[in-house]
């Protein structure tokens, strides 16, 4: 990976992280707190934008590798890693790999929740010791 690509991803990541915090704060402030609507909002919007970008990247040659890296891995990767999960799952479905897509969806959803809980409880138990 070239230093230009690394710089593109890093600067895009900075922008995406700031956007995530900003929009998450606005949405969370205005919506009820029973469901984390801020996170849901950035995940849904980020996934939609990722779909748009991937279509442009696949069917157009107007974007350089650095612009692609900046927008997809950088901005959207920091805005929401959910957009990557969404487009990878969609591409599996779109290519007819239904079982792989369902496995990917299940493993990501349930595996991430289990790992988050596992990490939480490891620290919780270690702080009690």
From Swiss-Prot:
Q: Which PANTHER family match?
A: FLUORIDE EXPORT PROTEIN 1-RELATED
Q: What kind of membrane protein is this, topologically?
A: Multi-pass membrane protein
What does the similarity note say? Answer: Belongs to the fluoride channel Fluc/FEX (TC 1.A.43) family.
Its localization reads: Cell inner membrane
Picking any one GO molecular function of the record gives:
metal ion binding
Q: Which domain of life is it from?
A: Bacteria
Q: Which reaction does it catalyse?
A: fluoride(in) = fluoride(out)
> InterPro entries this protein is in?
FluC
According to its UniProt entry, what is the function of this protein? Fluoride-specific ion channel. Important for reducing fluoride concentration in the cell, thus reducing its toxicity.
Protein's name according to its UniProt entry: Fluoride-specific ion channel FluC
- Which GO biological-process labels does this protein carry? cellular detoxification of fluoride
Statement: the UniProt record of this protein carries the keyword Manganese? no
State the GO CC annotations.
plasma membrane
The residues the record assigns to binding Na(+) are 77, 80
Pfam families named in the record: CRCB (PF02537)
Query: Which controlled-vocabulary keywords does the entry list?
Result: Cell inner membrane, Cell membrane, Ion channel, Ion transport, Membrane, Metal-binding, Sodium, Transmembrane, Transmembrane helix, Transport
The transmembrane segments are 6-26, 35-55, 73-93, 98-118
Control of this protein's activity is summarized as: Na(+) is not transported, but it plays an essential structural role and its presence is essential for fluoride channel function.
Organism, as annotated: Sulfurimonas denitrificans (strain ATCC 33889 / DSM 1251) (Thiomicrospira denitrificans (strain ATCC 33889 / DSM 1251))
* Primary location recorded for the protein, binned into one broad class: membrane
């Amino acid at each position: 990976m070239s230093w230009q690509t690394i710089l593109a991803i890093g600067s895009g990541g900075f922008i995406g992280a700031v956007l995530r915090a900003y929009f998450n704060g606005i949405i969370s402030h205005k919506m009820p707190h029973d469901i984390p609507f801020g996170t849901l909002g950035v995940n849904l919007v980020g996934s939609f934008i990722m779909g748009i970008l991937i279509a442009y990247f696949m069917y157009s040659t107007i974007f350089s590798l650095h612009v692609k890296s900046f927008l997809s891995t950088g901005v959207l990767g920091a805005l929401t890693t959910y957009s990557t999960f969404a487009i990878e799952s969609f591409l599996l479905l779109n290519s007819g790999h239904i079982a792989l897509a369902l496995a990917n969806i299940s493993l990501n959803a349930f595996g991430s929740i289990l790992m988050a809980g596992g990490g939480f409880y490891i620290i919780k138990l270690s702080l009690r010791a």
